[in-house]
């Protein structure tokens, strides 16, 4: 039995940091474990220009704890009106590493998202031309489609036409949750990758209803059946270079999670690598964690691997029940419970 695991310092390829006082409270959790992170642009207002991304990046760097080595990899929010010129400027910046596709209304702060991807054809052509990755929230928002089917329908109605029309466009299918998505990414032609969250590796949709409604397990895309969880575990632990770590850690104040109309998102930045270690250990695949967490992501994005390391030890510890979040608190996933791995 392995009691200590040292890996190349990992990166988080899907992260929400928020802004203001909340940003200052959460960014240190990520920077403690990860060398870099892809920063989601769904602020209010959304980050749609290079100038906005530069300003947000500066706020992130200013909020880091003293002595921290961490690089925020910025993204832009794709809208119906994003122009090819915006893409070229972003690529030339050197600090913007992707453009995020949110179907309008799909998740938190996605109201300004794309209503019809066909409106973005010239912009997608520019992205393909300059090598700018498209980061996709892969769910349709048609209210007639069952919420548990929205990812599979997205593959058929959006992803397949997108790949046909822009075969050289680098696409990241973010936070995949289904067997369909795992198989699609594994078998697709061209530059396609996928991030997988710790919570989708560890839990199925039953976790939402154990003894009552469990709002801190509510995220989008929602947790799926056990057959889908097992398929995600198989993909993550396969060693296939198209699958890599993306926490989708999404902090929300306790009051808006424990609410009649609660927000979607699980906060895992505080204990991300500990959760992934549990998932990989449960699958008897700790030897595959380094590739998934530290190697596949930078290789896909064409970035150098980190020079440092992260060590995890087998050690029981209790996760805080709540942590500060601006003027309020937030509840991390499994808050107050025991974990069996600890990053040092």
Swiss-Prot record:
Its EC number is 3.5.2.3. PROSITE patterns: DIHYDROOROTASE_1 (PS00482), DIHYDROOROTASE_2 (PS00483). InterPro entries: Amidohydro-rel, DHOdimr, Dihydroorotase_CS, Metal_Hydrolase. Its cofactor is Zn(2+). Gene3D superfamilies: Metal-dependent hydrolases (3.20.20.140). One of its GO terms (molecular function) is zinc ion binding. SUPFAM superfamilies: Metallo-dependent hydrolases. Zn(2+) 1 binds at residues 14, 16, 100, 248. One of its GO terms (cellular component) is cytosol. The modification N6-carboxylysine is found at residue 100. It is an enzyme of class 3 (hydrolase). The keyword Hydrolase applies. Pfam families: Amidohydro_1. Pathway: Pyrimidine metabolism; UMP biosynthesis via de novo pathway; (S)-dihydroorotate from bicarbonate: step 3/3. The keyword Hydrolase applies. Substrate binds at residues 16-18, 42, 137, 220, 252, 264. Catalyzes the reversible cyclization of carbamoyl aspartate to dihydroorotate. Homodimer. NCBIfam families: pyrC_dimer. This is Dihydroorotase. It comes from Ralstonia pickettii (strain 12J). The gene is pyrC.
């Amino acid at each position: 039995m392995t009691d200590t695991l040292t890996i190349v310092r990992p990166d988080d390829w899907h992260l929400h940091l928020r802004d203001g006082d909340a940003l200052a409270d959460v960014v240190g959790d990520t920077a403690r474990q990860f060398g870099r992170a892809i920063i989601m642009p769904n602020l209010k207002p959304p980050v749609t220009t290079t100038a906005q991304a530069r300003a947000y990046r500066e706020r992130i760097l200013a909020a880091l704890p003293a002595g921290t080595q961490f690089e925020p990899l910025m993204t832009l929010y794709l809208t119906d009106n994003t122009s090819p010129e915006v893409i070229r400027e972003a690529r030339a910046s050197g600090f913007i590493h992707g453009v995020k596709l949110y179907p309008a209304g799909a998740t938190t702060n996605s109201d300004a998202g794309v209503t019809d991807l066909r409106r973005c054809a010239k912009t997608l052509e520019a992205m393909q031309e300059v090598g700018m990755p498209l980061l996709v929230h892969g769910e349709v928002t048609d209210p007639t489609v069952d919420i548990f089917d929205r990812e599979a329908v997205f593959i058929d109605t959006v992803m397949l036409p997108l790949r046909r029309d822009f075969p050289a466009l680098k696409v990241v299918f973010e936070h995949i949750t289904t067997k369909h998505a795992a198989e699609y990414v594994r078998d697709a032609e061209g530059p396609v990758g996928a991030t997988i969250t710790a919570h989708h590796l560890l839990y199925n949709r039953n976790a939402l209803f154990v003894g009552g409604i469990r709002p801190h397990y509510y995220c989008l895309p929602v947790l799926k059946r056990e057959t889908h969880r097992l398929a995600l575990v198989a993909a993550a632990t396969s060693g296939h270079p198209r699958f890599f770590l993306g926490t989708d850690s999404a902090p929300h104040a306790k009051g808006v999670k424990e609410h009649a109309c609660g927000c979607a998102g699980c906060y895992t930045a505080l204990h991300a690598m500990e959760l992934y270690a549990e998932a990989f250990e449960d699958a008897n695949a700790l030897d595959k964690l380094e590739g998934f967490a530290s190697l596949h992501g930078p290789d896909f994005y064409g970035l150098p691997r980190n020079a440092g390391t992260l060590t995890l030890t087998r050690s029981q510890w209790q996760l805080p029940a709540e942590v500060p979040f601006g003027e309020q608190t937030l509840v991390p996933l499994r808050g107050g419970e025991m974990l069996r791995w600890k990053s040092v």
